[in-house]
């Protein structure tokens, strides 16, 4: 049987990335909560910066 989690970085970025979070009011709330908590990474895409 095929497992349900089939990871793809593009899909991960597009669904949970920084710009996606900024697009909605609740997403911005998520980011501000993570800033307030002092998270090292705010979102998925901030970790996956291309060099």
Swiss-Prot record:
NCBIfam families: rpmH_bact. InterPro entries: Ribosomal_bL34 (IPR000271), Ribosomal_bL34_CS (IPR020939). This is Large ribosomal subunit protein bL34. GO terms for cellular component: ribonucleoprotein complex; ribosome. HAMAP family: Ribosomal_bL34. Keywords: Ribonucleoprotein, Ribosomal protein. Residues 1-51 are annotated as: Disordered. Residues 42-51 have a biased composition (Polar residues). The gene is rpmH. One of its GO terms (molecular function) is structural constituent of ribosome. Residues 1-19, 26-40 have a biased composition (Basic residues). One of its GO terms (biological process) is translation. Coiled coil: none annotated. Belongs to the bacterial ribosomal protein bL34 family.
């Amino acid at each position: 049987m095929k497992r349900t989690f089939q990871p793809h970085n593009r899909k991960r970025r597009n669904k949970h990335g920084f710009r996606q979070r900024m697009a909605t009011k609740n997403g911005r709330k998520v980011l501000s909560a993570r800033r307030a908590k002092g998270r090292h990474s705010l979102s998925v895409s901030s970790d996956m910066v291309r060099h």
